[in-house]
């Protein structure tokens, strides 16, 4: 009777774990770090509970006890204790794939990916038709930084279960991380064929296409992504780069301005947009973005330096003076800031102020032992005095 009660309880837990696994597969989320531990938790518990059959107990009472204790610790997320129990169990039953799989799962949850790889690799040797094990092996290999081996493991998982969305997504994401953009696209398209609104598949397909210079194909993916992420400034920047590649400057500018609007209080984002404008020789737009960046973060040396530089390129000396004056206040020991400030002042024929700034620049160059800087500064001073 006791065995039957234990089996019934484990059967309930196993059913619950498997249900959780299915649910988590649908909601799997990835970042560039391939975070799919939420999915792994659900499936790992199912594997771990499968160590001890719901209806059959092992002949060895000591093994039964160790596995029950390991499963209980796993359920309670006491992974270090679970590892101890499973390792002891393996001394009694060394060739059981399920015990190796449970050990691998517990090790993975502790962040010990290299040892988890060893456990899952042994599990796959003992059960070479178990897609769950190959999937878990792929995850831990990827977390260990061995993307090539991870790809092989995921490919085996997808061969065993070609219709499993999570496995295809895992394969695609590791291929993407490894820079295999062509192969990642193939895998992501399989995901999108089953789940056309999968945001991660859409985003990484998009990035893969952009990396491959296939802008026309990338453009097709944007409508769905833009609709799904109406407040994503980063996505608008990618869209802008795509449309610049398609020589549609007006649409690209519209995307960049939308990105700016979505991040008006983000100095770093304003700088990014400004740099894109500058590479496209759209200097008035770049100046506006850099000016906004300096307004949001008045301590940003980078923002003021870029602001001043872009203004000088268009001979917008008033904005250049504003930018470089602020930069000299933020960097009072930077001779280049004073030199550029002087050039901007001279652009407005403010010679006396320009000479004062150049004297400061020369002194700072001398303090640094920068003879070339001193010579350039003195040459400009002489030209102003002669003119």
UniProtKB/Swiss-Prot annotation:
PROSITE patterns: TPR, TPR_REGION
Gene3D superfamilies reported in the protein's UniProt record: Tetratricopeptide repeat domain
Key words of the record: Repeat, TPR repeat
Residue spans of the TPR repeats: 63-96, 97-130, 132-164, 166-198, 200-232, 233-266, 267-300, 302-334, 336-368
Pfam family of the protein (one): TPR_6
Protein name: TPR repeat-containing protein SYNPCC7002_A0425
């Amino acid at each position: 009777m006791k065995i039957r009660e234990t089996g019934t309880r484990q059967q309930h837990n196993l059913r619950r774990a498997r249900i959780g696994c299915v649910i988590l597969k649908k909601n799997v989320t990835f970042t560039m770090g391939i975070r799919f531990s939420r999915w792994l938790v659900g499936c790992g518990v199912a594997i771990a509970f499968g160590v001890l059959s719901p209806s059959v107990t092992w002949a060895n009472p000591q093994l039964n006890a160790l596995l029950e204790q390991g499963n209980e610790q796993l359920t309670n997320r006491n992974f270090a204790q679970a590892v101890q129990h499973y390792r002891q169990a393996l001394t009694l039953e060394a060739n059981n794939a399920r015990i190796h799989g449970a050990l691998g799962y517990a090790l993975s949850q502790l962040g010990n990916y290299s040892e988890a790889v060893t456990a899952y690799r042994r599990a796959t040797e003992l059960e070479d038709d178990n897609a769950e094990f190959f999937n878990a092996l792929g995850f831990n290999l990827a977390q260990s930084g061995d993307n090539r081996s991870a790809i092989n493991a995921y490919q085996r998982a997808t061969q065993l279960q070609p219709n499993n969305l999570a496995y295809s997504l895992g394969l695609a994401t590791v291929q993407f991380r490894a820079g295999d953009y062509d192969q990642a696209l193939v895998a992501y398209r399989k995901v999108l064929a089953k789940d056309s609104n999968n945001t991660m598949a859409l985003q990484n397909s998009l990035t893969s296409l952009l990396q491959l210079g296939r802008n026309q194909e990338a453009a097709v993916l944007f409508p769905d992504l833009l609709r799904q992420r109406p407040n994503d400034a980063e996505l608008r920047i990618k869209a802008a780069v795509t449309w610049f590649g398609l020589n549609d400057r007006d649409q690209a500018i519209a995307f960049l301005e939308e990105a700016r609007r979505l991040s008006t209080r983000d100095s770093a984002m304003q700088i990014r947009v400004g740099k894109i404008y500058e590479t496209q020789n759209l200097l008035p737009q770049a100046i506006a973005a850099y000016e906004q960046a300096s307004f949001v973060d008045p301590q940003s040396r980078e923002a003021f330096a870029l602001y001043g530089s872009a203004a000088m390129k268009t001979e917008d000396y008033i904005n250049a003076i504003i930018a470089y004056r602020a930069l000299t206040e933020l960097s009072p020991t930077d001779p280049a800031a004073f030199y550029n400030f002087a050039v901007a002042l001279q652009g407005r024929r403010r010679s006396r102020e320009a000479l004062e700034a150049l004297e400061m620049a020369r002194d700072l160059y001398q303090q640094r032992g920068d003879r070339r800087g001193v010579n350039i500064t003195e040459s400009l001073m002489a030209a102003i005095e002669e003119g």
